[in-house]
Amino acid sequence: MKSKVVLLLTLLAAAAVVHGQHDPHFWPGHSTIVHLFEWKFSDIALECERFLGPRGFGGIQLSPVNEYVIVQRGANRPWWERYQPVSFKIISRSGNEQDFLDMSRRCNAVGVRLYVDIIINHMAAHPGDSGDGVGVGVGGSTAIPRDRYFPAVPFGDADFNPSCQITDWGNAVQVRDCELLGLPDLNQAVGNVRDRSVDFLNHLIDLGVAGFRVDAAKHMWPGDMEVIFGRLKNLDPSFGFAPGSRAFMMQEVIDNGPHEAIRKYEYTHLGTVTEFMYSFYVGRAFVGNDALIWLQTLGVDWGLLPSRDALVFVDNHDNQRDHGSGGQGGNILTHKAPRPYKMATAFAAAFPFGQLRIMSSFFFDDSDQGPPEDANNNIISPSINPDGSCGNGWVCEHRWRQITNMINFRNVCWGTPMTNWFSSGQNKIAFGRGSCGFVAFNNEPGQDMLEVVQTGLPAGVYCDVISGEKVGSACTGKSISVLADGRASISIARDAEDGVVAIHIESRL
């Protein structure tokens, strides 16, 4: 009997870990993760306090925070140098450990959680710029990648898989045990690799993070990851987490369909998984290469993960540079096409599927270009313009009115079902979220949308949160009147600045 009790307790503990790794630990009234790509810790802390917390954002994906090799590429250092680690010390162009802790305290205090992009699949391949094969990290640590010598961890040759290149993406063993883009491939079955990885992640938990984005999860064996994740501490209650909370996991698994040797489903027991096909399907529709009407059934029937397991996004830092898009870059929407991008993001925020993450980018002319920097390679802080947008080379999609207000829509209507689906032709659609919210889209070339549709909302005059917002009892954009029976006349001109309107119960005037 005693052995049965022990087994039951073990199974219950394992189930709690798995369930916990799907929970992002948002504050009530908050949702959505924003990737503040390449931001400094001091700027992130300020953005939490002045914008993200008050506006109801749930959390932030941080760029890698541990030490990486310095790569000098002309006048600009590439963004991808962060993905070439030389140690697990918390030091980067974003700041040091004290800067990180200050950011963590300030963001958690206003209800914004932090998720660190972690690299435990590999170490740096770039030999640095000295010509002697010795790479120098941003914190001064040195490494000799060609010899697999990383003394600041420490890692040596015995901690890596035998050197081989991925030449056959249809071979799952090769994809997991050989070198991704020549990066020395750590062997997560080795005790030292597991110990150092666990120590690194536990230290970040001590510093107040809510979870992790696991880079290159596809290139690691799920069984090894399960061992590492199972050894992590519970989240620290001093940062506002409930006792017993487990770290949220976002695992990067690029799965572009059944032809893949490694499938996303192999990782769902460990947490959420990046759903790249969601990005493709939504982008293809709003680019105009597919009809909006088909999006009504977007989900598992399309080959997507179940909603609980899916981390969904319109774009991410890779596929906006045509990396990991499976040759479908033309169907990936980014800030460079603002009108359809805002429409696609509004759809993703309103459609009740998956855990949503949005991008906050910097402008770039080529795919290697790093963040805005000064003559000494210091990252330049975003400036905030009078209209709330960003300057100094930063896009800040999360501050675009249409996107910010749709995150609020998502928060207000959290947990309500999709109702009252409407379509006219191929590319005019609308749907409600119970008696809470309503959105409509017109992506029909050369045609206006003028329809009387059922919103599901109580009677009243509502402020369209796409064209403006409610200020007191007034609306800075256009207003929409809902009749006693829930119907409303919806008008979206073919050449409207935004091809979408949205109203919700809190935008009633």
List the model feature ranges, each with a label:
Residues W39-S42, E444-G446:
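Short beta->alpha connector loops
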Residues M1-L9:
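Classical eukaryotic N-terminal signal peptides for Sec-dependent ER targeting/secretion
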Residues W27-G29, Y68-R105, R146-N187:
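Aromatic- and acidic-residue-enriched carbohydrate-binding clefts of CAZyme catalytic domains
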